[in-house]
């Protein structure tokens, strides 16, 4: 193996740059030529390859986003997309590809692997919903950001006796809402994995009002419903008794300098991915379990969605 490439695909996540940095520097140390593919699979199909040096990744440890850029690529869902991608990699004499992203990225990677390309996946998504790993790059930073948002909304909610409905990212799982809400002190956390009714949220608010609370914070994962819809329902069923606002942090949750935990996780996974390629272990994702790195087949990593820890959810309901 002499030439490898790395790409970031799908939604960006804090720590992707740290992973790219580790891949490049570990690859160069092993005597490899390392290329970045700009804008993920879209850039792969367009031939946007760029050789990287040790200096070119200097400073990436601290940077949010992705210096080599991300994109979603619908063509990878079509039969011709992965075949064309594999042909381009072969013509470029790329001996191995490292993909950093979430479930969509790994589905594309698996299809390219089936065309004969050695591939390693590194989980980079703020959703933390990839089977086979307990943590994904970017999740810790996004949790910090979301809890930061909730803490500041609490200040104004308390000052004005308001109820805030905060909408967190998470289409299929509620990991971000659960961790961010628990750390931020949300009164109610609504996630896709747990059926809920608006009446339950209102009952919690009324109970807290009887206890003397004058403000309330409800966190809802986007996959569990829309904040604006819950605001409308509560306004309709409280007859103006509550002053209610919706707050949608949106893509703020994706941004910012990665936390120390994300930087270290990304660096470890990047190094492990290069080692696995060199040792011939491919069509796998690098995951983490009990603090140790593990190797999981891409087939397993794309098999469904990792659901929340229900014991932790019960704790969130209690405290």
Residues covered by each model-derived region:
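N-terminal phosphate-binding or glycine-rich loops at protein starts, especially the Walker A/P-loop
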Residues: 1-45
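Short, acidic/small-residue loops that bind anionic groups at enzyme active sites
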Residues: 35, 113-140, 145, 190-197, ...
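Short Gly/Thr/Asp-enriched flexible loops that form oxyanion-binding sites at enzyme active sites
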Residues: 18-23, 104-117, 177
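Phosphate-binding loop/pocket of nucleotide- and phosphate-handling active sites
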Residues: 284-319
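Glycine-rich oxoanion-binding loops at beta->alpha junctions
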Residues: 44-99, 105, 137-148
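Short glycine-rich or small-residue beta-strand-to-loop segments that form or flank ligand, phosphate
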Residues: 3-10, 66-71, 96-99, 164-167, ...
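Accessory alpha-helical/coil subdomains and C-terminal extensions
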Residues: 99-101, 107, 111, 139-246
């Amino acid at each position: 193996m002499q030439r490898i490439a790395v790409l970031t695909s799908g939604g960006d996540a804090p720590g992707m740059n740290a992973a790219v940095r580790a891949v490049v520097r570990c690859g160069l140390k092993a005597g490899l030529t390392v290329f970045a593919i700009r804008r993920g699979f879209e850039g792969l199909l367009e031939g946007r390859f760029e050789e990287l040096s040790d200096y070119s990744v200097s400073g990436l440890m601290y940077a949010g986003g992705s210096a080599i850029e991300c994109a979603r690529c619908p063509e990878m869902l079509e039969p011709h997309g992965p075949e064309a991608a594999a042909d381009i990699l072969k013509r470029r004499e790329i001996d191995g590809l490292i993909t950093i992203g979430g479930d969509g990225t790994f589905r594309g990677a698996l299809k390219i692997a089936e065309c004969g390309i050695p591939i390693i996946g590194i989980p980079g998504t703020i959703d933390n919903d990839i089977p086979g790993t307990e943590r994904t790059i970017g999740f810790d930073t996004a949790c910090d950001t979301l809890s930061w948002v909730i803490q500041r909304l609490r200040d104004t909610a308390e000052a004005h006796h308001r109820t805030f409905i905060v909408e967190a990212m998470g289409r299929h799982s509620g990991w971000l809402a659960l961790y961010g809400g628990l750390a931020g002190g949300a009164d109610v956390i609504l996630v896709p994995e747990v059926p809920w009714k608006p009446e339950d949220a209102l009952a919690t608010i009324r109970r807290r009002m009887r206890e003397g609370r004058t403000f309330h914070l409800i966190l809802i994962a986007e996959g569990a419903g829309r904040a604006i819809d819950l605001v409308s329902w509560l306004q309709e069923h409280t007859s103006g008794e509550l002053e209610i606002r919706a707050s949608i942090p949106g893509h703020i949750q994706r941004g910012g300098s990665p936390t120390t935990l994300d930087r270290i996780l990304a660096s470890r996974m990047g190094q492990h991915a290069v080692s696995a390629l060199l040792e011939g272990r491919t069509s796998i994702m690098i995951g983490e379990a009990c603090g140790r790195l593990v190797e999981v087949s891409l087939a397993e990593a794309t098999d469904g969605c990792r659901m929340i820890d229900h014991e932790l959810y019960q704790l969130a309901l209690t405290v």
